[in-house]
Amino acid sequence: MHPSDFGVRTLDGVADDWPIDYWTLEPYFAENDRMTGVAGLAGDPAYPPHQPNLPPVPLGKTGTRYARAINQLGWHWWPSDIAVATMEYDGRGKCINLGHCTPGCAQGAKASVDITYWPHALRARVELRTRCRVREIATNEHGMASGVIYYDPNGVERFQPAEVVVLAANGIGTPRLLLNSASTRFPTGLANSSGLVGKNLMLHPWPQVFGYVAEEVDGDRGPQTVMWSKQFYETDRSRGFVRGYTLQFTRGTGPANEAITSMAAGRLPWGKADPNRAYGRSRDLPVPAQGASVHARVSDHAGSDGRSQ
């Protein structure tokens, strides 16, 4: 995200501004990048100043071909930031170009929670309970969080007392828990005196476009992410619309991966009709009508009173 994303109402007259700015969050972005081991190249003129911890992923033949084409257009491009260890880092092996990253990384170079945050937490004597699901946050007679009610792996309801409860359940799970924690004291859910919990949900949809070139570009060697272009990111009213987008240039992943990732659609998208799925999709803006709420009558698989919708 860029600083302008936090002030779209002020800058462009659409949606709403965030209650905080980019620079308030920037130290936390930097700490997360450090913990996950983000590779990249400092100095991108189209991005806020930051210092990746690791050298960028090599462009390879694919990136070199992209760069040649983008340079002919006169557009901005820069090696992408990517959470892949390009050298040994925090006990993880470096990327050795085993192939694309979607199926996972046997080398341990691709960052994921189980090899970044969890090992540090476990070494700090944190107890990690997996396959559990929190139903609601409990409060005491003073209206303060006192713990959580959750289901263990066997579906048994349990209570875990706590002095502090930290919510980190993403843009859908977090409001679900807050709304499901309604009580006589908090009839509309916890932390919801504004009525905005679950509102202004911002997702990150993205379309894909595939192309072909005549020469060999070794698309199967190395992580998919190669470079990005911020040429169209910031508002340029001469285009006839406000806001913009990032162009992310990647390596190909081959027919097997395309088939695997298309299973959710129930069919393999192909041919001239396939691009119709992507038309009109862009980054969501914060608007009250878009959000996560709790269904009044439908229960989830664990029997909770509401299900996010």
Question: Residue ranges of each PLM-predicted region?
Answer:
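Short acidic (Asp/Glu) and glycine-rich catalytic loops that position anionic groups and cofactors
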Residues: 4-8, 46, 305-309
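FAD cofactor-binding and catalytic pocket of flavoenzymes
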Residues: 18-22, 28, 194-308
